[in-house]
Amino acid sequence: MAAVDVNQPITGHKSAIIRNYNTNPRLIYQTVCGVNGPLVILNDVKFPQFSEIVKITLPDGSKRSGQVLEISKNKAVVQVFEGTSGIDAKNTICEFTGDILRTPVSEDMLGRIFNGSGKPIDKGPPVLAEDFLDINGQPINPWSRIYPEEMIQTGISAIDVMNSIARGQKIPIFSASGLPHNEIAAQIVRQGGLVQLPDRPHEQTNFAIVFAAMGVNMETARFFKQDFEENGSMENVCLFLNLANDPTIERIITPRIALTSAEFLAYQCKKHVLVVLTDMSSYAEALREVSAAREEVPGRRGFPGYMYTDLATIYERAGRVEGRDGSITQIPILTMPNDDITHPIPDLTGYITEGQIYVDRQLHNRLIYPPINVLPSLSRLMKSAIGEGMTREDHSDVSNQLYACYAIGKDVQAMKAVVGEEALSSDDLLYLEFLTKFEKNFITQGHYENRSVFESLDIGWQLLRIFPREMLKRIPESTLEKYYPRGGAKE
């Protein structure tokens, strides 16, 4: 009988850690002929491969990594993730690995903090990798996708009643600099969970959060880290931080590494993953920088013409897959430059994603939190996630009626500024009263106030009772009979 090596599993684990990102070098070159921004151009390269990873050793011995972006005969253009400062054309050594960019993934990543390239920065050991996955992900067969139908209760009335989020949806927060989008995202992460129906047992879900920050300042990174630690969810969070002083080019791979980790947690570990990406505007600007360095023909406002396709490769990595228990729900945050919703970044994002949550500066200036303007906000998958058996049978009607009354109230408010309050009819005054109370009682709530969807609907009914019953034209008579009388919504 052959002797069994008891150290074999340990040796295997050791090699897994040591291997980490390293791939055996294929060919070594010292033929750098030019450096342009984040790009390095090499001459006399034999058989370079598109998207191949290149290990770069600088004259001082420090190592960087890059990716082949372009190939022309025997020339290769390499994008360096850590930046090109200090690269010397004569003494820089480039190793072509013959492999694409892979990231080590494991369930042990939860509770850890990584930099934008996926390397640990929390003074902990390297991740004991269960697998090395391509950061561009596996394409999901559209036929295998499951339509998102379970509503995520965020505890925020303006989202739960008016723009319900389904598990597996991708819905961005459209914000601007100086607005509390980070606080809203943290509140959604803190309070998010399935709707608990009264007649069903309480469900404990297998929940995880993947948070990727691109180009954020230290204060934002500290805010999220502290918030996760304070509410006790840090052991279920995987943080990827590319700060404002980190290399710009690293921002291009940060969301992809984060989503690769999320896909592993969702489809292999059967977890329901919430992915928060902030700030997508920094990502798009990094894309523009690379495009300008490659001297490509620019599109609108200098952004590359392929930005729509590139953003889709990130946003489309959300959803549910048949035969797998996990799901990925995406909440990207983007800051609109100059509060302009027609800017290419929010414009293209809105085309790809399934709605948007619009954070409004005027509401914020009036000290309303969360300053979510429900009129330009939208959730395209709301209709399939609400109603009898999922939330409550009156949900859709209440939402429509609140929208209608709020929109009319806004028109009346604009008219009042022109003609004065004396010229308004009694109906107009009712809409004005509704407008004030809607913003004060329905939209406004505390940072730690967690309202169930049923509480939010009841507040909606309290506001609708401002109007006589015959003015509520968007709610069927049978629903009015059940919920319009005082106390009806509570029963």
Curated annotation (Swiss-Prot):
An annotated Gene Ontology molecular function: proton-transporting ATPase activity, rotational mechanism
Biological process, per Gene Ontology: ATP metabolic process; cell-cell adhesion; energy coupled proton transmembrane transport, against electrochemical gradient; positive regulation of apoptotic process involved in development; positive regulation of neurotransmitter secretion; positive regulation of programmed cell death; proton transmembrane transport; regulation of intracellular pH
One Pfam family from the record: ATP-synt_ab
tRNA processing keyword on record: no
Tissues/organs with expression: Expressed ubiquitously. Highly expressed in the H-shaped excretory cell, the excretory pore, the intestine, and hypodermal cells. Expressed in the nervous system. Expressed at low levels in muscles.
Keyword terms of this UniProt record: ATP-binding, Hydrogen ion transport, Ion transport, Nucleotide-binding, Transport
Binding-site residues, ATP: R380
Summary of the function given for this chain in its UniProt record: Non-catalytic subunit of the V1 complex of vacuolar(H+)-ATPase (V-ATPase), a multisubunit enzyme composed of a peripheral complex (V1) that hydrolyzes ATP and a membrane integral complex (V0) that translocates protons. V-ATPase is responsible for acidifying and maintaining the pH of intracellular compartments and in some cell types, is targeted to the plasma membrane, where it is responsible for acidifying the extracellular environment. Essential for the proper assembly and activity of V-ATPase. Required maternally for early embryogenesis and zygotically during morphogenesis.
SUBUNIT field: V-ATPase is a heteromultimeric enzyme made up of two complexes: the ATP-hydrolytic V1 complex and the proton translocation V0 complex. The V1 complex consists of three catalytic AB heterodimers that form a heterohexamer, three peripheral stalks each consisting of EG heterodimers, one central rotor including subunits D and F, and the regulatory subunits C and H. The proton translocation complex V0 consists of the proton transport subunit a, a ring of proteolipid subunits c9c'', rotary subunit d, subunits e and f, and the accessory subunits vah-19/Ac45 and vah-20/PRR.
Protein name according to UniProt: V-type proton ATPase subunit B 1
Gene from which the chain derives: vha-12
